[in-house]
């Protein structure tokens, strides 16, 4: 997404950027999980399992520092991996914030996009588990990584709830995932659907590998994916043969949120990567209605860069939508080599 190995003089992309070919828009040594994950998910189905451990080991090497973040900043267990992270396990300093207020939580990135976004590690945990399902891989070296990543969410959100009141769980015995973040888009969320779907799917998959009572109990504390009704104007009323407003049940980005800060569509993450909804699964219509009627999903729809609308369309059985978006995504780029896309939201070439 950020140029890969094949960068060239940035003035050919943006004449204002008078730097060397080593320039990358979001920094040269920073791992941005939201972008990187889309390079690795397809490797499961293409059988390129030998290419995946380099990414898994990247996180495994950083595990101790990620755990130290939790110990030092909040005095609890679990690994806290940030979205934009250096190869030693700490946040990119520019995103962490050079001009931070002294009173601000030292564990948080002082950044409107990245604050509270800690769940992208769970996609790589799921990939690790899937390599066992697809290829019978020995994932023993990564089990501490998976367990520590899950533990963080359990301990951190119990801690935050206990600071606000007497009880660590809600009235239904569920974690209160607040404050959270649904991708970089919906901020200060309460129970983001993307985080809930991630925790539920990783826990369900991990329990099949390690049937431990601890993880079963944690699974019981994960709240349901939040739903909401959206008014759809000019819907066909078959009984009256007229066009009247209707209400469609859809996946909500979260139970609540304070602002929108980017253009991702986390309300469809329960479709992909988490596969809770899809063809052959329950409540397919809820997910399809989210795709077709959610106003932000429609506003944010695109084939550019890390956009994954074509994947969602395919998972929902929307063949023509998937075809149209995929053809647009894979059309020739603007450079001599036709598969050099970008800059899109990032840099050129954009591989994701």
Which residue ranges define each predicted feature?
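Secretory-pathway/luminal and periplasmic proteins that interact with or process carbohydrate-rich
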Residues: 1, 15-16, 51, 64-69, ...
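Gly/Pro-rich turn-and-neighbor structural signature
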Residues: 1-18, 53, 216, 235
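Short, solvent-exposed turn/loop segments enriched in Gly/Ser/Thr/Pro and often Arg
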Residues: 1-12, 59, 71-78
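An acidic- and aromatic-residue-enriched active-site/binding cleft used to recognize and process polar
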Residues: 1-13, 129, 151, 158-159, ...
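Short, glycine/acidic-rich hinge or "gate" loops at secondary-structure transitions
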Residues: 2-9, 141, 159-174, 214
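Acidic/His metal-coordination segments adjacent to aromatic residues that form catalytic metal sites
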Residues: 8-27, 85-114, 177-192, 254, ...
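Active-site core of glycosidic bond-cleaving carbohydrate-active enzymes
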Residues: 32-67, 76-85, 90, 108, ...
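Acidic/histidine-rich catalytic neighborhood
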Residues: 148, 152-209
